[in-house]
Amino acid sequence: MAKIKLYLYVSTLITASFVFAEASWEPLFNGKDLSGWRATDPSKFKVEDGLLIGFQNDGKGADLRTVDEFDHFELKFRYKRTEKGNSGIWFRQFYQFDLLDMMPVTLSGAFYYPKCPTTFVWKNVDESLEKTNEWNEGQIYANGNRIIFWLNGQMLGDETLDPKVHRISKSGSIGVQVHGGDAFKGMQVTFQKIDIRSLNPGDPPSMPVVVVGE
């Protein structure tokens, strides 16, 4: 009987650990309103027909950020943007998955990081990866200092940030940026979904880790 009880106890622990490790995806945007979010300028964000929309027509930008903060996670989002739009997904305070066309410098999928020496940890110059004014799928893996981005299933970069080179942020809110500037007047970025999945330290990414061109 003691052996059976021990077996059941160990099995329960293993099952519980597996369930915890395989945390389910949870929506950050509920498709109805901006509950759980706060904006620096609420006039630049709205929910319409189940979609989260960020826009500016006056040259002034704004951020919309979650009330909650996150450390180890995967984030996936479905979005489309206008051609001259400049936006991005903030995470861990000042890391950003860029959503823009700023050629010849970079395109959507760049890892914008103003606290690093080069401003970008990596860039994207492949124009075929994003569809302007159509739905696109972005995904972020942030576990410890390791960051990976995907755009429409293609991996854009996989970097373990070096504290000797980069200013490291361990956690922070998730945010949507509407970039300021007259050049971006009339811009709009639209999100159909923004989902998050908590990770344990060291959990592997759910997407393939293969760099474009390999």
Residue ranges and their predicted role:
Residues Y9-S17:
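Bacterial N-terminal signal peptides
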Residues A21-E214:
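Carbohydrate-interacting regions of secretory-pathway proteins
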Residues M1-V10:
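Bacterial N-terminal signal peptides that target proteins for export
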